[in-house]
């Protein structure tokens, strides 16, 4: 019971810290799923009020993300998402302006099940750290500038049991 309470308190402190840092994000940043306030509302100005014929001009595309269901987080000019390569789930960093691949780090093994393979979560960026959880429960914290993994845990380390659809 004490161990579970300790884990819960640690998790609550992490969420509290991340939430505090997110409120100080740059206006153009979208550092977590659904945006800074998790409302899906952008504070950007000068956005298109209607789509031009044929849609807006495509600026870039990226085709090396592999499988998965991750959305995107954007902070300090870098777009982060999760995908798969070489049998592993990975955290991918791209230049948000050009789409240039800035690198990737392994999060964990690929989650495979009847709902589709790959990660389900969206990275969160706070305080210079990118937090990413793979479908199998691996959670990493990586430096947002260098990609160096600061720490890595798995939910099973804390008694977590993988849901049928994954984390």
Protein language model annotation of sequence segments:
Residues 1-12, 16-22:
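Bacterial N-terminal signal peptides that target proteins for export
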Residues 22-167:
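Noncatalytic, solvent-exposed loop/strand surfaces
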């Amino acid at each position: 019971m004490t161990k579970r309470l300790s884990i819960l308190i640690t998790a609550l402190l992490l969420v509290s810290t991340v939430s505090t840092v997110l409120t100080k994000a740059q206006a153009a940043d979208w550092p977590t799923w659904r945006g800074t306030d998790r409302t899906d509302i952008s504070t950007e100005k000068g956005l298109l009020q209607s789509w031009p014929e044929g849609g807006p001009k495509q600026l870039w595309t990226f085709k090396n993300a592999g499988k998965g269901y991750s959305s995107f987080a954007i902070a300090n000019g870098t777009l982060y998402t999760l995908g798969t390569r070489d049998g592993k789930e990975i955290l991918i960093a791209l230049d948000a302006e050009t789409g240039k691949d800035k690198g990737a780090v392994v999060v964990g093994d690929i989650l495979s099940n009847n709902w589709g393979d790959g990660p389900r979560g969206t990275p969160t960026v706070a305080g210079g750290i990118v937090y990413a959880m793979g479908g199998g429960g691996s959670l990493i914290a990586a430096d947002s500038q260098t990609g160096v993994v600061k720490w890595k845990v798995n939910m099973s380390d804390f008694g977590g049991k993988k849901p049928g659809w994954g984390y």
